[in-house]
Swiss-Prot record:
Gene3D superfamilies: Translation initiation factor 3 (IF-3), C-terminal domain, Translation initiation factor 3 (IF-3), N-terminal domain. GO terms for molecular function: ribosome binding; translation initiation factor activity. It holds the Pfam family IF3_N. Monomer. It is found in: Cytoplasm. One of its GO terms (cellular component) is membrane. The keyword Cytoplasm applies. This is Translation initiation factor IF-3. The gene is infC. It comes from Chlamydia pneumoniae. Belongs to the IF-3 family.
């Protein structure tokens, strides 16, 4: 975030609309008088809105103001959770024990709030029987139904079968679809 406010002597306008440190309107004053008031208060004169005529300036502690802005920005970045797509790769003839391990791995990804891309890779003549891959992917997505929902149905893409499971429930998916439909209608 660019913090490029003009302060004190950087302000070049002959007259400014002044706002006091408590937020009260002090009226339109000459820049010299506004700087004197700020100096008497032991604070800075900061140009808040340069677009208006005359520019709006406020008496405040500029260091404290800048610190507050950067702190707000950091807090808002912390609050955001970036959803990542994690991938779990399977084979159509996977053993039961290996399958349960992959299912546990996928569950931890979904519980942490990430989407899971389930990929069933076919080798050689395994592609002649894609229904085996569909069964494995279906079983995996059913194992994740209580904590997530199928966002993209299983489909064949080259030599692999791909399905995406997102965190949440089917109810949240329906709410998202309704909000998208309302956005498109407006």
């Amino acid at each position: 975030m660019a913090l490029n406010f003009k302060i004190n002597r950087q302000i070049r306008a002959p007259k400014v609309r002044l706002i006091g440190s408590a937020g009260e309107q002090l009226g339109i004053l000459a820049i010299k008088d506004a700087l004197d008031l700020a100096r008497e208060a032991g604070l800075d004169l900061v140009e808040v809105a340069s677009n208006s005529e005359p520019p709006v300036c406020k008496i405040m502690d500029y260091g404290k103001y800048r610190y507050g802005l950067t702190k707000k920005e950091k807090d808002s970045k912390k609050a955001q959770h970036q959803v990542r797509i994690k991938e779990v790769k399977l084979k159509p003839n996977i053993d039961e024990n290996d399958f349960s391990t992959k299912l546990k791995q996928a569950r931890t990804f979904v519980e942490k709030g990430n989407k899971v891309k389930i990929t069933c890779m076919f080798r050689g003549r395994e592609l002649a029987y894609p229904e085996h891959g569909f069964k494995v992917v279906q079983k995996m997505s059913q194992g994740l139904e209580d904590i997530g929902f199928v966002e993209a149905e299983p489909k064949l893409a080259g030599r692999s079968l791909i399905c995406v499971v997102a965190p949440g429930t089917v109810k949240t998916k329906k709410k998202q679809e309704k909000s998208h439909a309302q956005d498109e209608n407006q």
